[in-house]
Amino acid sequence: MSTGTVVQVIGAVVDVEFPQDAVPQIYDALKITGEGACKGLVLEVQQQLGGGVVRTIAMGSSDGLRRGLEVVNTGSPISVPVGVATLGRIMNVLGEPIDECGEIGEEERYVIHRSAPSYEDQSSSTELLETGIKVIDLVCPFAKGGKVGLFGGAGVGKTVNMMELINNIAKAHSGLSVFAGVGERTREGNDFYYEMKDSGVLDKVAMVYGQMNEPPGNRLRVALSGLTMAEKFRDEGRDVLLFVDNIYRYTLAGTEVSALLGRMPSAVGYQPTLAEEMGVLQERITSTKSGSITSVQAVYVPADDLTDPSPATTFAHLDATVVLSRQIASLGIYPAVDPLDSTSRQLDPQVVGQEHYDVANGVQTVLQRYKELKDIIAILGMDELSDEDKTAVARARKIERFLSQPFHVAEVFTGSPGKYVSLKDTIRGFKGLLEGEFDHIPEQAFYMVGTIDEAVEKANKKK
């Protein structure tokens, strides 16, 4: 173990000088050993500048750091605890417990920088994962072992949707979950912990948090720490769920680190290595012949612009994309999923079956027609439409409302109990709507209900 000294501190970037014959390797973890507030602070080597000097990024607050402090090279990258000891615990990027429940007591640690599984080891599955959320199960179904992105601007419900997915899948799935909070609000991390505790599934979830107030190095690596824990469960032959909130903050942390390291920015100020950094993370989130990782990632969309380099780079890696729309949210329809923009590789008659495919296609066709007619209705009114178009508009409005659904995790502020709708009931309901079975029921009856039977019951009560 070689020792060096701090020679320069610029915010989160720290330059450390080592003897010429003992220069640390890229990604090695260094530890500050000197006395003071910074004792034990971990630095990760990013660049070798020559002359024995390495440039590092601090994994914690650099307050109190000064030149001349002694630094020890640990000789390996950052490692985190893995295995069953991590379940029910909250850890930081270094795998240290932050829930005041004592030591983790792990039997094994893995380094967070690992290579993705080889082509031979990877496997793909077409088995569907039912979420109980109508719009998702119908239009953009998830695959077991697939990657899903929840795209949306600020305040359209990414985190609430993710919480509902965790609530529905983690409980029904009864497998293990890993939650990586990357640069999000501490309050949300706190809510999530108590949500899991109250519902009795905390002992099946490992949580890794690197929240908004953390330095960029911490936020850049916390997703890898969470993923490493998920990989261990997968390699043991289990099916594991990985939730990442928010993948955009991972990109943003990369941008901050890149600027601090003095790299020339590329489009819109992002780091020049954006695609590579995203690939390093996403290629590891995959299923192998031994087990599967099903991942759900929230993706913040800056200024609601899906062509922004960060969400655009993420799109390429996903099997299903759930796009949340501000327009739909403004109509009071939640979840605010855009059924015309959301896609899934699984929506194929050979995977989901002909009936499901036809119903999903029919719903999209009717909604697309309504979208096209909106301008005519705004200018000339409904009376100018043909009878066929009037029927299409009436059905589309009912479908729009029927795509809404009360969530379990939102019971506190909506006051209505959450609903889990099976795929069979979802298809039956939308098929009936498309075939005109419910043309006699007013559209208000379809708003915020679970199954179609509830809508019929609601309409009968109002009579």
From Swiss-Prot:
Q: Which GO CC terms are listed, alphabetically?
A: plasma membrane; proton-transporting ATP synthase complex
What domain of life does the UniProt record list for this protein's source?
Answer: Bacteria
Q: Where in the cell is it found?
A: Cell inner membrane
Membrane topology, record value: Peripheral membrane protein
Gene Ontology terms, MF aspect? ATP binding; ATP hydrolysis activity; proton-transporting ATP synthase activity, rotational mechanism
Its EC number(s): 7.1.2.2
Q: Where are the transmembrane segments?
A: none
- Tell me which UniProt keywords the record has, alphabetically: ATP synthesis, ATP-binding, Cell inner membrane, Cell membrane, CF(1), Hydrogen ion transport, Ion transport, Membrane, Nucleotide-binding, Translocase, Transport
Reactions this protein catalyses: ATP + H2O + 4 H(+)(in) = ADP + phosphate + 5 H(+)(out)
Any idea which positions bind ATP?
A: 152-159
Q: Which InterPro entries match?
A: AAA+_ATPase, ATP-synt_VA_C, ATP_synth_F1_bsu, ATPase_a/bsu_AS, ATPase_alpha/beta_chains, ATPase_F1/V1/A1_a/bsu_N, ATPase_F1/V1/A1_a/bsu_N_sf, ATPase_F1/V1/A1_a/bsu_nucl-bd
Q: Principal localization? A: membrane
Question: What NCBIfam families does this protein's entry cite?
Answer: atpD
Cited function: Produces ATP from ADP in the presence of a proton gradient across the membrane. The catalytic sites are hosted primarily by the beta subunits.
The family this protein is said to belong to: Belongs to the ATPase alpha/beta chains family.
Provide the assembly information: F-type ATPases have 2 components, CF(1) - the catalytic core - and CF(0) - the membrane proton channel. CF(1) has five subunits: alpha(3), beta(3), gamma(1), delta(1), epsilon(1). CF(0) has three main subunits: a(1), b(2) and c(9-12). The alpha and beta chains form an alternating ring which encloses part of the gamma chain. CF(1) is attached to CF(0) by a central stalk formed by the gamma and epsilon chains, while a peripheral stalk is formed by the delta and b chains.
Q: What is this protein called?
A: ATP synthase subunit beta
Give the originating organism.
Shewanella denitrificans (strain OS217 / ATCC BAA-1090 / DSM 15013)
